[in-house]
Design a protein with these regions (language model features):
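Secretory targeting and sorting signals
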Residues: 1-27
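Lectin-like carbohydrate-binding module/patch detector with strong preference for beta-trefoil
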Residues: 28-173
Length: 173
């Protein structure tokens, strides 16, 4: 009987090793999200109405604790990032076909219209410009210095002015 038990235990141990039964628990890494606020208005970059839809507009609005104002920076090679909305998992997208406005769309790593770079423009205040890879001399701009909620930023020629400078406040979750 002892020999049968020993054989069964050996077989069970071998099966566990093959199946990876002896694994080490790993915690999921925390993702750092950022809330981007325009310097001139203090308003946050927001996916309008918390929409999950492909093509939903990115707008500026009063900063809240909503996940539609939190964005992860996903590495896209050569110092560029995809800016992914926490609430929808979709990425900020711009381009000529969108009249250089910003929307969320399904993330596709091979789309240059979804790759951005963050340019630090003021080390003291931590202000950045968000520039699309296809238009390196252009950056995310709130039009006409507007401070109104619901205004959709577009891509404008970088002039290092306050509607083009954004604070990036980290939030880990």
């Amino acid at each position: 009987m002892a020999r049968i038990a020993r054989t069964a235990l050996t077989a069970a141990a071998g099966l566990a090793a093959l199946l990876g039964g002896a694994t080490t628990a790993h915690a999921e890494p925390n993702t750092t999200y950022f809330r981007f606020a325009a310097e001139h208005s203090g308003k946050c970059l927001t996916v309008a109405d918390g929409s999950l839809a492909n093509g939903a507009a990115a707008v500026q609005s009063t900063c809240t604790t909503g996940d539609n104002q939190l964005f992860a920076l996903k590495p896209a090679g050569q110092g560029y990032f995809m800016i992914q909305a926490k609430h929808s998992g979709r990425c900020l997208t711009t381009g000529a076909d969108l009249n250089w406005k910003v929307q969320q769309k399904w993330c596709t790593s091979d789309l240059s219209t979804q790759r951005w770079r963050m340019v630090l423009v003021d080390m003291t205040t931590g202000l950045h410009q968000l520039c699309p890879v296809d238009q390196p001399a252009y950056c995310l701009t709130v039009p006409d210095y507007s401070t109104a909620d619901g205004v959709q930023p577009g891509i404008g020629q970088c002039q290092n002015v306050s509607p083009q400078r954004w604070t990036a406040t980290a939030s880990v979750s």
